[in-house]
Amino acid sequence: MSDDRKQIKRALISVYDKTGLEDLARALNDAGVEIVSTGSTAAKIADLGVPVTPVEQLTGFPECLEGRVKTLHPMVHAGILADTRKEDHLKQLDELNVAPFQLVVVNLYPFTQTVASGADFDACVEQIDIGGPSMVRAAAKNHPSVAVVVSPSRYSEIIAAVGNGGFTRAERTALAVDAFRHTASYDVAVATWMGEQIADADKPFAEWIGASYERANILRYGENPHQAAALYTDPAAPAGLAQATQLHGKEMSYNNYTDSDAAWRAAWDHERPCVAIIKHANPCGIAVSDVSIAEAHRTAHACDPVSAFGGVIASNREVSVDMAKQVSEIFTEVIIAPSYEDGAVDILSQKKNIRILVAPQPQRDELEQRQISGGVLVQRRDLVDAEGDTPANWTLAAGEGASEELLAELEFAWRAVRAVKSNAILLAQGGATVGVGMGQVNRVDAAKLAVERANSLAGDEQRAKGSVAASDAFFPFADGFEVLAQAGVRAVVQPGGSIRDAEVIEAANKAGVTMYLTGARHFAH
């Protein structure tokens, strides 16, 4: 037995979450450990027939103020904070008739769960734990003498340690680190929520941002093999792609996650059944279909079958057996969906390496952050929900008003172009992209690329002719539009707002092309 183990003779237990409490209490009692406990925890232990000392018996002071004060007392904290390596501490304990604790087991009031439930302000405030964090921090500070455990998932470690003569110093230090992280996350949640309650409605961004993330996985590498990488999750946030359930395939890579996030967002930009195929965070193809999700996948893939090789597929509907059969014929890195029809996973998993994920619908009110040197940029995520994203609010600037069918085509293109890196021009026909010009430093080249890809990837077919186009930002000159008109594009939707809008609109009228202005922009960098 290592000399730095601290035999557990006395334990303080105060937990809101009673998971595993019975096994823990019985194991401690069987090992001869004295248990001191509080409130409902003490009552639960007593109901088990396990000897327990209520904390008020220890302090000689009753629980008061509706339970707000239970453990905030020197008889408790002196027993936690005494450094038993020091003779003067031991002497003071003896003089004060205080016995030291070697183990503190505490978990906190469910503050974040209460906030998430929609409870009112006072109810949320009532769930801000005071005594719990005080005990946890005290025990963590005094880890040379005390082990602190804040999660029921670690109770098995306590039971093992009791049988082995206590925790080692290294184990107590690791537990202390876990405890400080726990209280730090708790305080961040409280401070963030309180700040939101007093925020000025005209200033939607908080004066202070705190965040806590837990490492979920160390990845093989980052964007490139020489870059180390890891995945972290926010335990207080609603589940998202980072918490997706993987049903099959190799481990997710850094690039798999970035492409999957782009694909998942792109698919859910559409209310209709949609499939998005993404590679290097840009669409190879996006399509909607009211016929079947398999049809949406077929037409999305047809946009650019060359680039779709090794891509990421996202569906905003259940993946059908028919779609699974189509996907199984193509090399695909990742497929993500809210669910899979019976038999679909069996078909997909015939490919050993394909990663099959189940993920919840993305949250619609997220802020997004981007690190820059010395700080972080924060913005509301582009959810394609600006006033100008609704066709009813568009302005007809040139040509004849669109039919219901044509307007639906334009709306699809407009929603799809959000997923394309700027400068972006997207061509669509029949509810599917047919040519995507992405990531160009001028709009003329983006238009040329969209037309070239629409036509060159279709053999003898000139898919640009008769298509509709969406531009993520205005045309600064008429030249970008003229590329589209010469290719036979029949209608264009774009934000407008250029000082040369009149020139662009005049060119559209001359070409007989319908043009709508949205007043909204969808840059993506």
Curated annotation (Swiss-Prot):
Pathway: Purine metabolism; IMP biosynthesis via de novo pathway; 5-formamido-1-(5-phospho-D-ribosyl)imidazole-4-carboxamide from 5-amino-1-(5-phospho-D-ribosyl)imidazole-4-carboxamide (10-formyl THF route): step 1/1; Purine metabolism; IMP biosynthesis via de novo pathway; IMP from 5-formamido-1-(5-phospho-D-ribosyl)imidazole-4-carboxamide: step 1/1. It comes from the Bacteria. It catalyses: (6R)-10-formyltetrahydrofolate + 5-amino-1-(5-phospho-beta-D-ribosyl)imidazole-4-carboxamide = 5-formamido-1-(5-phospho-D-ribosyl)imidazole-4-carboxamide + (6S)-5,6,7,8-tetrahydrofolate; IMP + H2O = 5-formamido-1-(5-phospho-D-ribosyl)imidazole-4-carboxamide. Its EC number is 2.1.2.3, 3.5.4.10. The keyword Hydrolase applies. The keyword Hydrolase applies. Keywords: Hydrolase, Multifunctional enzyme, Purine biosynthesis, Transferase. One of its GO terms (molecular function) is IMP cyclohydrolase activity. Disulfide bonds: none annotated. Residues 1-150 form the MGS-like domain. InterPro entries: AICAR_Tfase_dup_dom_sf, Cytidine_deaminase-like, MGS-like_dom, MGS-like_dom_sf, PurH-like. GO terms for cellular component: cytosol. One of its GO terms (biological process) is 'de novo' IMP biosynthetic process. The IMP cyclohydrolase activity resides in the N-terminal region. Belongs to the PurH family. This is Bifunctional purine biosynthesis protein PurH. It comes from Corynebacterium diphtheriae (strain ATCC 700971 / NCTC 13129 / Biotype gravis). The gene is purH.
